[in-house]
Amino acid sequence: MMINAKKLMKLAKKWQQRAALKRKRISFQRSSITTSSQTAVEKGCFVVYTADKIRFSFPLSYLSNTIVQELLKISEEEFGLPTEGPITLPFDSAFLEYLINLIQRRMDEDTEKALLLSISSARSSFQPQQHCSATQQLLVF
C-alpha cells in the first residue's frame, strides 16, 4: 500500500494544523527523535504518544515512511482523529523504539514488507488484555 506524495502532504498538513492548535511555542530542532514530557513541539517535528503515555517527537520527514504511515492509520482506526488531545499509538514505547531503530537502519524493501505484515497481523489480533503478546509476535531483525 503506497500513498502518493500529494495525499501524504495533505495528511501531513492536516496533522500539523491540528498540532498547531495545541502548541504555544516552537523551539528549534536539536535531535531527530526525542522522548520527553515537554509540551512544546520543535519546529519541523510532529509528536505522538504511545499507549503507555510516553511522548515521541519525530522529524516531519518520517511522514513519508510507509511504516510511520501505517502506524498513523492504525492510530486513526483505533482512536479516531484527535480533536482535543495528542496522537496516540496503540503500542507501547518499547515497540515504537524498536520500529524507530529499524527505520533508522534503512531496511530493505523485503524487510519493510515483512514488518508491515507483522504490524498488520499484530493489529488484527490486538485485544487490550493481549497487547503484550501481540507485540511479541512481531518479527525481530
UniProtKB/Swiss-Prot annotation:
UniProt feature coiled coil, ranges: none
GO BP term, pick one: auxin polar transport
Tissue expression as described in the entry: Expressed in stamen filaments and petals.
UniProt key word Ubl conjugation: no
GO cellular component: nucleus; plasma membrane; pollen tube
Compartments where located: Cell membrane
UniProt keyword terms in alphabetical order: Auxin signaling pathway, Cell membrane, Developmental protein, Growth regulation, Membrane
PANTHER family in the cross-refs: AUXIN-RESPONSIVE FAMILY PROTEIN, AUXIN-RESPONSIVE PROTEIN SAUR61-RELATED
Protein family per UniProt: Belongs to the ARG7 family.
Name of the protein this chain belongs to: Auxin-responsive protein SAUR62
Annotated source species: Arabidopsis thaliana (Mouse-ear cress)
Lineage: Eukaryota, Viridiplantae, Streptophyta, Embryophyta, Tracheophyta
